[in-house]
Amino acid sequence: SPGIYYAIAHDKIGKRLFSSTVIPNRGAWLEYETDSNDVFYVRVDRTRKVPITVLIRALGIGTNAEIVELFGEEPKILASFAKDTSTNYQEGLLELYKKIRPGEPLAVESAESLIMAMFFDPRRYDLAKVGRYKFNKKLHFNKRIVGHKLSQDVVDTTTGEILAEADTLVTKELADTLQNSAVP
C-alpha cells in the first residue's frame, strides 16, 4: 500500500545500513539505501542505483555548494559527492536519465520531460491520501514543525481555505490542524 517503509540491516562488520522505500499510489518507486562507506544511494523504479546527489541535481539543486547549503555538512551527502560524476544540473539530469532509460539518446529536453512526468505530473505520480498520511505519521511531521515559522501560506487543497499565513509561528495546535487537514 502507498507510504514509506524503513529497514535497517548490518554489513559483515556490524555497521548499520539504512534503507527506505517510498511507494506511491501511482508512479515511480524511490528506494534509498546506504552502503558500508556511508554513501547514500537512490534507485528510481528499481533501476540501477545512483548517488543521491545525482537525483538532487536532477531535481534542480545543481552545485555541491547548493546541496551543502540545503543539507548541511551531512556525512552521507559528503561521501556521496565522491561517487557522483556529475557536477551540475544538466550532468545530474543526464546521468539519472541514463540509468532510467539506458540505450536511449541523451538529450536534456528528454531528460527534463521524463523527470517532470515521473514526479511532478499528478496524473502519473500520486501518493494518495493514505500514502501522505503514512508519510507524515512516520516522519513525525506535526512534532518537527512546532516552533518554526511558515515560509508561505498553507492552503487546504479541498476547500481553498487559508489555514495559516506566511511567517506564522507553528504551535502544537496548528501543527495538529495541518496534520489532519488535506494539506499535501
Annotate the PLM regions:
Residues 1-184:
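N-terminal non-catalytic structural scaffold regions of very large proteins
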